[in-house]
Amino acid sequence: MFKGNVNKNNPEAYKSNGLKVHMTNICSEITLHTDESHSFVCCLSSLNLSRYDEWKDTDLIYHATWFLDGVMEEFIQRAKGLRGFENAIRSAVKGRPLGLGVLGWHTYLQDRGIPFEGLSAQYETRKIFSQIKIESERASRDLADLYGEPLWCVGTGMRNTHLRAIAPTVSNSKLAGNVSPGIEPWAANVFTEQSAKGTFIRRNPSLENVLEDNGINTEKVWQQILADGGSVQNIEELNDVLMGDWDEPVKNVFKTFKEINQLELVRQAGIRQQYIDQSVSLNLAFPSEATPKWINKIHMEAWKQG
């Protein structure tokens, strides 16, 4: 987290009350005021972008914001009087900050044949997150009309100091149909996962559909992908396979985390941040041969992007 960027871009409710952000949570998507009397609260939910076409023309974002505000109210009511919750309650009552985010971003792109790198992905970023901003703010204004503005929002016409934050969603993404986590790329197209329930082989469902459509969804192909660390770049059967409206090579569409230029993740994050009033949980993945100069350049670009 770049604290200077965060405070420079704080929402009006924070600026008018002289509130500052001093730290973030362990996943870095929460950027809320803390002091001796206030601690931040995480009231989060995520929209499944792999189903975007099903909900883009509905009021899902609007109702999700109402839902989160209801969750915040229930927390306030249940935690009142409980020892140790005093600072969290104080922050919740005064600001009612929410964190509506997303999951399944890479799945969304892959299902449409859009590479993670390039202008098409940047366009989709702007389109989707501007919509989330508009609809969540509409909901907060309506909530304020009905229930009033909390202390830190007086004069803003809003029910909540904050509305949007993007959490990692690793577990939620599995429950949502094994889609990609948060706004990050897939680390691998096939991998072994160990859990309390046992050891499982996880495959990228979007890639599995492409292989099936081209008659090459075989165990031999998957074993080769697994041997290559989850990469499809050495699968000869995919050399001439194209997909999407723009006939993109499948190998470009299914690049894994480390195969994607990390500058692209930072640039997308910069676009996304224009529409998010908290922050984004975003990892970067560098190969072992990455130089300190290159890693420093990426982080400096992140700072410049805000």
Predicted features by range, described:
Residues G4-E29, A139-A165, T169, A285, ...:
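Conserved mixed alpha/beta core segments that line enzyme active sites in large multi-domain catalysts
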Residues M1, V41, G95-L100, N160-R164, ...:
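Beta-sheet entry/capping signal
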Residues Y108, W152, A290-P292:
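Domain-core detector
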Residues C27-H33, M72-K80, R164-G306:
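Catalytic alpha/beta core of large soluble enzyme barrels
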Residues P97-P115, W294-G306:
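Hydrophobic/aromatic-rich, well-ordered segments within soluble, folded domains that form packed cores
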Residues E36, L49-F67, R90-P97, E117-S136, ...:
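Catalytic cores of large soluble enzymes that bind and process phosphate-bearing ligands
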Residues H63-I89, V93, R112-T169, W246-K251:
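Internal maturation/activation junctions in enzymes
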Residues M1-A92, V102-R112, V179, E184-S206, ...:
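Function-dense linear segments that define catalytic or interfacial modules
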